Amino acid sequence: MSHFTDTLNPAQKEAVLNYDKPSLIVAGAGSGKTRVLTSRIAYMIEQGVHPGSILALTFTNKAAREMRERIEQLVPDGRARYIWMGTFHSVFYRILRQEAGRLGFDANFTIYDTANSESLLSTIIKERNLNTDEYKPRDIHSRISLAKNNLVTAEAYAANTSFVAEDRQRKRPEFSAIFLEYARRCKANNAMDFDDLLIYANILFRDFPDALEQYRNRFRYILVDEYQDTNYAQYLIVRRLAQTHSNVCVVGDDAQSIYSFRGAKIENILRFQNDFPEAKVFKLEQNYRSTQNIVNAANSIIAKNDRQIPKHVFSENDEGDRVKVLKAYTDQEEAYLVADLAKREGRENGGRWNEIAVLYRNNSQSRAIEDALRRRDVPYRIYSGHSFYDRKEIKDLVAYFRLIVNPRDNEALRRIINTPARGIGAVTVARVAAVAAERCVSMWEVLEGTGSEQVPELKTAAKKLADFTGLIRSLSLERSTKPLHEFGLEVATRSGLIGSYRMNPSPESENALENINELLSSMQNFKEERIVLAYEEDDGEADAEPTVEEWLQNISLMTDMDKEGEDSKNRVVLMTVHSAKGLEFDTVFIVGVEENLFPLSLIHI
């Protein structure tokens, strides 16, 4: 018997030892699923499974990092470094870079995060002179994302008469045209958004059987965490890869499926045994996290679910306090009720405000809670997913790196062509974009011609545009000659960003300079902190100087949960129920538990 199982309970131990057939591990909340997953992988390696043949897919990069660290503690001889581990997006980004040519992309393609995608959509909507109240970039992006998660491409969407009819009925008849133009521009910009990474992975495996066979043979053992929150695109990737060897292990809990609004399909976990008839089911039913009263309350609610995997979740912890149900007639009354109770709890627990959380279904519900907490002098913070990388100065500097790596990235070019100010106005930028559209080339290709008579429309701005293109070309030549952090400082300096803040001293400028310095420090440490890129088998990649492309991938593939930084401030935490997944607090208030709000009535994006 392996020492990896010494601290496991019987159910956990069984799930670890039986790894050579399809497995469904039903892991209730607080049941130690991470310990089981890491112990299972360590045991597989101990039994002779080559770590390079193991693919472990997680929900967040943070989860992947924590799992890898635990496995390295269990298998300290260095073999764990060869496991392919990360989110679906990070793993298949890595594969798509190798296969980009087959799909019509260059290997240095850019990844558009949500902000980049919404910026591009905003440009398209404005160019089409559409009402931004009817065509909000965020809503349009959400619907595009939902379509892609179900493997519906822009072309397929436009050809679907029911989709088009629904859009007309909902007074957004231009949606399919926006979708088509968005897809066209992403391709022209040599860019993929998050959802494209899954779409193109499926296209690769569908259209290129040799590629599918190659990765089937590489990934003989597949493990998927949080399987209840996978969408159709992710489901199909797993099905395709696991078809030959069938050594697939999925871990999840149908009772914790909370991302259907993002395209997650609870059917994926419910039909696993139909997909893999030889599958063995392991149930982790002991909750180590919660008191028995909380477990009982959760069980009584879950029992009402129409479709579920039968299980009996229990706790051997103390009974604990009973769940209290409090009534209020208005949201203001509810907010002050919570604020008063939170203030009392904070005083009684010695001022540990960060052990108190207020959960709600929608972000809009936080306003009343914030007002009440402020009036009661209770310190709080909003856990929103907004991050260091959302700050203007950071987005500006990152856009320079994006353009240097991928000159076809029009969105990056638009952001920095006059940042800091270099006398290139909005009219000139619009002319560049118009010429690019007319010639079916990127904006960068237009700029490269401004030094001659090729672009007469831009003759008056030719000198300024040539200076800008010269700067980018020069920096591009230097990126392979310097260590990453030194190159970062070079870009921040020669771009004029650092100088622009130093020339206008203010608290805001000082803060911006501190943030830029922090970003440069993160680049310096990146070699030791490669938390996204898995190690290539035996090629020494881990010891090589990291590239700008690798660093950009690291920050581009962060999920909202990964971006939410550690906050040492001692404050009550306000967050949506979705953000709270996997977190622990001593005291939790759930507000707005009322009809059509929690649970939310079905809405259409």
Say what each PLM segment does:
Residues 21, 49-53, 80-81, 244-247, ...:
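Short glycine-/polar-rich loops that comprise or flank the Walker A/P-loop
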Residues 1-112, 118, 189, 212-213, ...:
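P-loop NTPase Walker
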Residues 168, 352, 366-378, 391, ...:
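Conserved helicase C-terminal RecA-like lobe
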Residues 6-17, 21-25, 36, 55, ...:
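Conserved helicase NTPase motor core
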Residues 91-99, 255-262, 289-290, 383-405, ...:
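Short alpha-helix plus adjacent loop in nuclease-associated cores
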Residues 9, 57, 85, 110-114, ...:
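Conserved phosphate/pyrophosphate-binding and hydrolysis machinery centered on Walker-type P-loop NTPases
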Residues 29-37, 51, 100, 277-280, ...:
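Helicase P-loop NTPase motor core
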Residues 19, 80-82, 101-196, 219, ...:
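ATP-hydrolysis module of ASCE/P-loop NTPase motor domains
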